[in-house]
Every structure is written in C-alpha cells, then in structure tokens.
C-alpha cells in the first residue's frame, strides 16, 4: 500500500483514473456554466454599486461588505440579506476572524435565479439606481 491510496476504496480509485484520463468535454461545459454564473453575479453586484473583483478558478465569490453595512459584521449582514433580500450567503466570520468584513456567494444557482437575487440585494442595499 502506498501513502496515497491507503484506505481508499479501489473502485473509487479506478473511476477517478478513468475520469482524469478520459474525455474532458463535460469539464469544459461545467467550467463555462460556472464562468457564466460568476459573470452574472459579479457584473450585477458591480452595477448596483457593490464593487467585487472577478475571481478565477473557483465556484465562490468573496465580496467585501459595502461600507454602509460593514459595521454590522458578516453574520448580521448575512442575516439581513437572508431576511430582506431572500438571498443566502456565507458570513466570512465562519472562515476566521479575518473574514468578518466579507461574505461568500456560492455559484450554485442558474443565471435567472442569480438575477432575481441581485434585484433583491439592490433593494436592500439601495446603493445605486442601475438595474443588475
């Protein structure tokens, strides 16, 4: 037994090898889907006045809490978005003390639902008059 495969069920190892060495078309499709979701969210947040950088190679978007709301901390701000905008984000404090000025969006919803979320966020934040 090697250090790498100890305790890992052999059919899982074989399936992993086949997936890594096989056709990658489905990977390209998934990457494109997440890039589209990311672009809709980040571009929408920027349009409504919440500046967010475009992340690379992740299914999450980390966003610094807008200045007028930063005093709340990430937990209370997350609760505000959930209660008022019906949008769930992860409070940054859950990832350590340094994360308390941030929230994390997961790119798990389709583009239509993301646009709905942006409209709700826009109403709560009231930062800008532009549509998401």
Residue ranges and their predicted role:
Residues 1-132:
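PLP-dependent class I/II
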